[in-house]
């Protein structure tokens, strides 16, 4: 019998140390169980025609001590049978991932962006029972599309404690003509440094109640953030001022260095695994050519900087010059940054606080890209349209999703084309994520995305083909917003 569902069991994953064989992680208390609105608690059964697994991995989720650059954080992480929690596969592979929970509380794994069958989606109380301490669970699923993905816990605030790692799926249709390739994981970090994510949530939810400056319905301000406003996203881009921002698990003063040769063609796969931070990414002295977002190819677009919200991924290519170059990810609205170095020559590395023209350029919003022809969904008129209103405020700290004016799930029938009209009625940006499907954005020529950033006051139209039966989570990928109510689902009738 499946346990009752709790929004605090829906939190997404954290931070990976790509190539180091360890993944940082921690967890918040999943909290008391409470039924999700409209949840059937009956996942669609595992398909019988998956075939034998072609990629097998074993993971243990356990407490560990993480060195983020001369600073030890006692946290939680994934320990892999291969020594590296990152998983690589090829489109069409069948994965079997066996996880044993050595944590003191229940956990789960969600395979972010993968259009897998419902029973493997990793949402406790909706698609599976929680994996209790001492228990094991096997996830078996096909990866149908190539691209940059990641996996993470979907239990409590384990997102902000780092239980996550990259999942890279090779696409036989990609050229794969790069000389070097790096996976770049961006994260915000507090666990084991200044308390825990639960402590941060307690601060937010304990700020008081009622209207603030007459803006209750529009998400009034008054929280912990006092960063410099961003000219594209505004100043209220997050709720938590973290002590550290990381690239591949390292703080700026103990940064990662990526080495190549002058003239090399590099492919960089960026993943924002943060819980509350939108990053603006730039590489000093270079323009980047965007080739994919959220796993799907796009029409190549050259840019100097890119906004990457929580849960989004983007692939870029760049021809590397001769020298030592800063790779900087500004924490938008927080007056801080993550930092690494790309080196193709000897010499002194730049200081982490270095500013450069690309960093101050107008950043690219990924929703403005156009899809490659092979990523397009067939054009058609929607069979059903639902109105999605995003609401909430800081005081009291509460967030919500209303579907057609009700706090209930969106519904669809298999085979239908569903149009979701999302309206952000708050003063904050929200990265909205759909499980089990990938949207096509009509306003961007059919761009394929599973995570879309809605700026304050923005309306975005997103279509999907209902070809994957079950009940699927739909939520804000800001962990603190989802934990306090910005969560719903898409349910097949």
Q: Where does each model-flagged region fall?
A:
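Sequence-level motif detector for i,i+2 pairs with an aromatic at +2
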Residues: 51-56, 71-73, 104, 179-181, ...
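Histidine- and aromatic-enriched segments that form or immediately flank copper-ligand environments
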Residues: 53-174, 277-306, 326-335, 384-412, ...
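A generic beta-sheet turn/junction motif
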Residues: 272-274, 283, 320-322
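N-terminal secretory signal peptides
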Residues: 1-5, 16-21
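Extended terminal and domain-junction accessory segments
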Residues: 12-13, 19-22, 27-58, 163-207, ...
């Amino acid at each position: 019998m499946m346990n009752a569902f709790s929004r605090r069991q829906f939190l997404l994953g954290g931070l990976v140390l790509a190539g180091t064989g360890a993944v940082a992680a921690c967890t918040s208390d999943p909290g008391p169980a409470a039924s999700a609105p409209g949840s059937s608690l009956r996942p669609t059964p595992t398909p019988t025609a998956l075939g034998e697994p072609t990629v097998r991995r074993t993971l243990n989720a356990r407490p560990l001590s993480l060195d983020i650059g001369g600073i030890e954080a006692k946290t939680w992480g994934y320990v892999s049978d291969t020594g590296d929690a990152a998983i690589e596969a090829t489109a069409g592979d069948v994965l079997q991932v066996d996880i044993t929970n050595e944590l003191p509380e229940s956990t789960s794994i969600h395979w972010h962006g993968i259009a897998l069958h419902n029973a493997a989606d990793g949402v406790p109380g909706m698609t599976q029972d929680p994996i209790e301490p001492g228990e094991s669970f096997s996830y078996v699923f096909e990866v149908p599309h190539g691209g940059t993905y990641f996996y993470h816990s979907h239990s409590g605030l384990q997102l902000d404690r780092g239980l996550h790692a990259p999942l890279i799926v090779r696409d036989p249709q990609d050229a794969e003509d790069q000389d070097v390739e790096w996976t770049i994981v961006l994260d915000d970090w507090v666990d084991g440094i200044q308390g825990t994510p639960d402590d941060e949530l307690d601060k937010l939810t304990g700020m008081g109640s009622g209207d603030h400056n007459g803006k209750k319905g529009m998400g009034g301000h008054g929280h912990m953030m006092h960063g410099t406003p961003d000219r594209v996203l505004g100043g209220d881009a997050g709720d938590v001022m973290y002590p550290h921002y990381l690239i591949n698990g390292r703080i700026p003063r103990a940064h990662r260095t990526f080495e190549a040769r002058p003239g090399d063609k590099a492919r960089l796969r960026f993943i924002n695994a943060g819980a509350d931070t939108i990053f603006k990414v730039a590489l000093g002295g270079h323009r980047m050519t965007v080739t994919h977002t959220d796993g799907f190819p796009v029409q190549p677009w050259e840019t100097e900087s890119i906004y990457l919200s929580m849960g989004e991924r983007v692939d870029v290519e760049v021809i590397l010059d001769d020298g030592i170059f800063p790779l900087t990810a500004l924490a938008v609205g927080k007056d801080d940054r993550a930092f690494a170095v790309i080196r193709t020559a000897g010499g002194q590395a730049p200081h982490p606080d270095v500013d450069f023209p690309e960093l101050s350029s107008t950043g690219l919003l990924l929703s403005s890209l156009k899809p490659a022809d092979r990523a397009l969904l067939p054009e058609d008129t929607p069979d059903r349209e639902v109105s999605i209103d995003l609401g909430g405020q800081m005081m009291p700290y509460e967030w919500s999703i209303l579907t057609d004016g009700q706090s209930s799930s969106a519904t669809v029938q298999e085979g239908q084309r569903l149009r979701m009209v999302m309206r952000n009625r708050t003063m904050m940006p929200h990265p909205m994520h759909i499980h089990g499907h990938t949207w096509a954005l009509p306003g961007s020529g059919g761009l394929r995305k599973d995570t879309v950033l809605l700026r304050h006051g923005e309306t975005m139209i997103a279509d999907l083909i209902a070809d994957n039966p079950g009940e699927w989570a739909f939520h804000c990928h800001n962990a603190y917003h989802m934990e306090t109510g910005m969560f719903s689902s898409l349910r097949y009738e």
